[in-house]
Amino acid sequence: MFKRKSTAELAAQMAKLNGNKGFSSEDKGEWKLKLDNAGNGQAVI
């Protein structure tokens, strides 16, 4: 298992990843990412 990191670090990491060529720009609207109060992430694709 892996340990959960701080949500601030994860948010910074996600911000870095968003600029990369992982996803094409027209796919941007297909991904809905959110965090709940406990810091657990969900993605609706």
UniProtKB/Swiss-Prot annotation:
GO molecular function: DNA binding; zinc ion binding
Swiss-Prot/TrEMBL GO biological process terms: DNA recombination; DNA repair; DNA replication
Keywords of this entry: DNA damage, DNA recombination, DNA repair, DNA replication, DNA-binding, Metal-binding, Zinc, Zinc-finger
Quaternary context: Homodimer in the absence of DNA, monomer when binding DNA.
Note: Interacts with the polymerase and the uvsX and uvsY proteins.
Purpose of the protein: Binds preferentially to single-stranded DNA and therefore, destabilizes double-stranded DNA. It is involved in DNA replication, repair and recombination. Binds ss-DNA as the replication fork advances and stimulates the replisome processivity and accuracy.
Protein name: Single-stranded DNA-binding protein
